[in-house]
Amino acid sequence: MGFRVLVLVVMATTSALPFTFSEEPGRSPFRPALRSEEAQALRHGLTLLLARRADGQPPDMRQPEMRRPEVRQPEFAELSVGQRRWDVDQCMYYCLTGVVGYSYTECQTMCT
């Protein structure tokens, strides 16, 4: 989200600059630029976005957050420590001897 705000600020400031570069001979390299409706709309949108952010409201452009449902395994919590250790060892054995060829750290990450 911070990157989008930074991009909007850069776009608004560069489009709001009062001068553009001109390479016509005999003229000043800078001439006044016209402020377009698009630049004004962008500045207005940025102002609203920053005002909402200051108020603590989520901006309209942001996607609603999707929460994943928690996957709970009650049978694992009810197992004894020795039984859990056996399951981890068995998982490690099948992971390391499998056809896929996982490394030890990959298997350890998946099994624990």
UniProtKB/Swiss-Prot annotation:
**Organism's domain of life?**
Eukaryota
Q: Propeptide residues?
A: 23-85
Signal peptide residue numbers: 1-22
Q: Where in the cell is it found?
A: Secreted
* Known tissue expression: Expressed by the venom duct.
- Skewed-composition ranges (Basic and acidic residues): 62-74
Protein name listed in UniProt: Conotoxin vil14.5
Q: Which organism is it from?
A: Conus villepinii (Villepin's cone)
Provide the organism lineage as a comma list. Answer: Eukaryota, Metazoa, Spiralia, Lophotrochozoa, Mollusca
